[in-house]
Amino acid sequence: MNFSRRSLRVGAIVNVSVRSLLMRGKNRNKCNSIIFLTVGLLLFIAALALGVLVLFNGYQVNVNANGVDLKPFEIVHFPFAVKTFLSVLTFVLAAFGFVCMVASFLYFVSFKKLKPKANSAS
């Protein structure tokens, strides 16, 4: 195959940027732990916001002469198919958030285990 120098250069830049997302070197486990923790927290927040938007049913309180009347309401009304899709999407976001948190924990544990111990040579 014939590749131009420009396409090879762009491919190399993309490859380097993807590789640098996960750090290497001295503090790689600590940096990876922070990256996965941040991504996991963002996914959990997105899942929570989407879940509240789609699944939250509340009640509007109307007080009238007949007493207290509770009327159900939804924040946003979606058709059933859209609600089902967004519910599944909420679950997937929460699942990926959980996986990122577990990866963060494993990187953190490996960082603690590989920490150099001080020699007490007296």
UniProtKB/Swiss-Prot annotation:
<keyword id="KW-0812">Transmembrane</keyword>
<keyword id="KW-0472">Membrane</keyword>
<feature type="transmembrane region" description="Helical">
    <location>
        <begin position="34"/>
        <end position="54"/>
    </location>
</feature>
<dbReference type="GO" id="GO:0005886">
    <property type="term" value="C:plasma membrane"/>
</dbReference>
<feature type="transmembrane region" description="Helical">
    <location>
        <begin position="91"/>
        <end position="111"/>
    </location>
</feature>
<keyword id="KW-1133">Transmembrane helix</keyword>
<protein>
    <recommendedName>
        <fullName>Uncharacterized protein MPN_594</fullName>
    </recommendedName>
</protein>
<keyword id="KW-1003">Cell membrane</keyword>
